[in-house]
């Protein structure tokens, strides 16, 4: 029986889609959309909402495709990523480059046409920072790759805000700071239970270079900092009681996970904490949105 993979149109499309890391792209776009709605007391113009969502999503996908291209040999050595079409050699380097270029070009054009030049240039800079500075320089060179490189991944709320207002005020940077501080514990938890993967691939992730105990301590410390930072929208007056209540409850659960990881680590616990960290960020930003529109109604 011939078991060779047949590249039907459907399977080929799914391979290209996989290069864009759809789940990560969705979370980035979600945070950008929340930034759009928080930027205005009313509703976001449909043209800006649609154009900003599509444009940011396309440029994000373009950056992730470049990441898959650069890391195809590394991905092939890691169980978590060995399935990727780029790692398996199912899509050529030229095809990935062409795909990324088309996505990036369409994304830039969409943002320029439907939002404003500032959003286009900020988005290009953001995802170049991820695809080039983080992927090529930081990730293979320093265990602080996630901390420094997290700046590019934290930008989506500012991109969304800029799409609506043409500016990036202080409130937008608070949202960026939340994601920036969230990024290290989110990825370090993953790196703990995938330590062998990173070690085999020669990547200097924190558990590989500094050990498990050091990483567990820093997950706890960053989660404490994150809890404090998530109070800033309420303190600054950007958000009210609905958000504050949500941030405290969600943060308390995250802190409980971080404390358990520090005191009594297991891979199973780390997996649950990693999954929760994604749920945490999604619900936190959803709470910002609900509070934004509920606050004038309930007066809190």
Curated annotation (Swiss-Prot):
Signal peptide: none annotated. It is found in: Cell inner membrane. Gene3D superfamilies: UbiA prenyltransferase. Pathway: Porphyrin-containing compound metabolism; heme O biosynthesis; heme O from protoheme: step 1/1. It holds the Pfam family UbiA. GO terms for biological process: heme O biosynthetic process. It is an enzyme of class 2 (transferase). The chain crosses the membrane at residues 24-44, 48-68, 94-114, 118-138, 146-166, 172-192, 217-237, 239-259, 278-298. It is a multi-pass membrane protein. GO terms for cellular component: plasma membrane. Keywords: Cell inner membrane, Cell membrane, Heme biosynthesis, Membrane, Transferase, Transmembrane, Transmembrane helix. Its EC number is 2.5.1.141. It catalyses: heme b + (2E,6E)-farnesyl diphosphate + H2O = Fe(II)-heme o + diphosphate. Belongs to the UbiA prenyltransferase family. Protoheme IX farnesyltransferase subfamily. Carbon 2 of the heme B porphyrin ring is defined according to the Fischer nomenclature. Converts heme B (protoheme IX) to heme O by substitution of the vinyl group on carbon 2 of heme B porphyrin ring with a hydroxyethyl farnesyl side group. This is Protoheme IX farnesyltransferase. It comes from Burkholderia thailandensis (strain ATCC 700388 / DSM 13276 / CCUG 48851 / CIP 106301 / E264).
């Amino acid at each position: 029986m011939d078991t060779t993979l047949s590249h039907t149109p459907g399977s080929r499309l799914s391979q290209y889609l996989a290069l864009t890391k759809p789940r990560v792209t969705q979370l980035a776009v979600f945070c950008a959309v929340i930034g759009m709605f928080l930027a205005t007391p009313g509703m976001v113009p449909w043209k800006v909402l649609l154009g900003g969502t599509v444009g940011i999503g396309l440029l994000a996908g373009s950056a992730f495709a470049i990441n898959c291209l650069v890391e195809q040999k590394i991905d092939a050595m890691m169980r978590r990523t060995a399935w990727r079409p780029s790692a398996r050699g199912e899509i050529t380097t030229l095809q990935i480059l062409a795909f990324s270029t088309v996505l990036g070009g369409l994304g830039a054009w969409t943002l320029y046409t439907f939002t404003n030049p500032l959003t286009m240039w900020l988005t290009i800079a953001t995802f170049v920072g991820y695809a080039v500075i983080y992927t090529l320089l930081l990730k293979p060179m320093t265990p602080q790759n996630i901390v420094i490189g997290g700046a590019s991944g934290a930008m989506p709320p500012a991109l969304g805000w800029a799409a609506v207002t043409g500016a990036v005020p202080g409130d937008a940077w608070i949202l960026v700071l939340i994601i920036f501080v969230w990024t290290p514990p989110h990825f370090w938890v993953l790196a703990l239970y995938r330590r062998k993967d990173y070690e085999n691939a020669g990547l200097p992730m924190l558990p590989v270079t500094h050990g498990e105990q050091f990483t567990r301590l820093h997950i706890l410390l960053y989660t404490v900092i994150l809890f404090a930072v998530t109070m800033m929208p309420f303190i600054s007056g950007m958000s009210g009681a609905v958000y504050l209540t949500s941030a405290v409850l969600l943060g308390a659960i995250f802190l409980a996970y971080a404390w358990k990881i520090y005191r009594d680590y297991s891979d199973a616990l780390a997996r649950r904490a990693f999954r929760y960290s994604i749920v945490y960020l999604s619900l936190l930003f959803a709470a910002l949105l609900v509070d934004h529109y509920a606050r004038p109604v309930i007066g809190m």
